[in-house]
């Protein structure tokens, strides 16, 4: 049927006066880097969060596909496990809209046993550690680890310059 995507959701866009695409809801689509990904990496989730809880946060966004959680053991003896979270969208523009809307979103403000940093979503575009990941002002200062990517916003915070 014309105007509908494979999954039955209506697919439409409008061109704005400056020829930029207008995304869903009439909002201009954000400018995207050429290597933009449709997958977001979420950090700051509590160790006991579930896939269902994270899905509940992202489900209202157009293009949401799925959440993948990976539990990793702590690098420190006796430390809490670390949760890696990846959220997939249909396209990079939809991922960017969710990223901008939820940056710094508080997920668990009652969990007193959680460290102060835990419970605040910090989102980044998921990308291979081989490449650079624009986090703040399109600058990435550090790649750490083989498959993970930690981003530091200033050179002073980074001890492993990767550029």
Curated annotation (Swiss-Prot):
Q: Which InterPro entries match?
A: Meg, Nucleotide-bd_a/b_plait_sf, RBD_domain_sf, RRM_dom
One GO molecular-function entry = mRNA binding
Q: Which UniProt keywords apply?
A: Disulfide bond, RNA-binding
> Where in this chain does the record put each RRM domain?
38-117
**Which tissues does the record link to its expression?**
Ubiquitous.
Disulfide bond residue pairs: 140-162, 143-151
Under the heading SMART domains, the entry gives:
RRM
Q: Which family does it belong to?
A: Belongs to the MEG family.
This chain's protein is named: Protein MATERNALLY EXPRESSED GENE 5
Q: What is the lineage of its organism?
A: Eukaryota, Viridiplantae, Streptophyta, Embryophyta, Tracheophyta
């Amino acid at each position: 049927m014309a105007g509908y995507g494979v999954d039955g959701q209506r697919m439409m866009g409008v061109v704005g006066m400056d020829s930029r695409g207008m995304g869903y809801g009439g909002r201009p689509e954000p400018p995207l880097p050429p290597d933009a990904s449709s997958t977001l990496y979420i950090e700051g989730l509590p160790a006991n969060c579930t896939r269902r809880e994270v899905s509940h946060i992202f489900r209202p966004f157009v293009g949401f596909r799925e959440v993948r959680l990976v539990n990793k053991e702590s690098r420190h003896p006796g430390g809490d496990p670390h949760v890696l979270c990846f959220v997939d969208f249909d396209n990079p523009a939809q991922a960017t809209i969710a990223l901008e809307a939820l940056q710094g979103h508080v997920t668990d403000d009652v969990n007193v046993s959680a460290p102060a940093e835990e419970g605040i979503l910090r989102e980044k575009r998921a990308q291979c550690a081989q490449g650079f990941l624009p986090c703040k002002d399109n600058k990435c200062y550090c790649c750490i680890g083989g498959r993970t990517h930690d981003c530091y916003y200033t050179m002073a915070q980074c001890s492993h310059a990767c550029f």
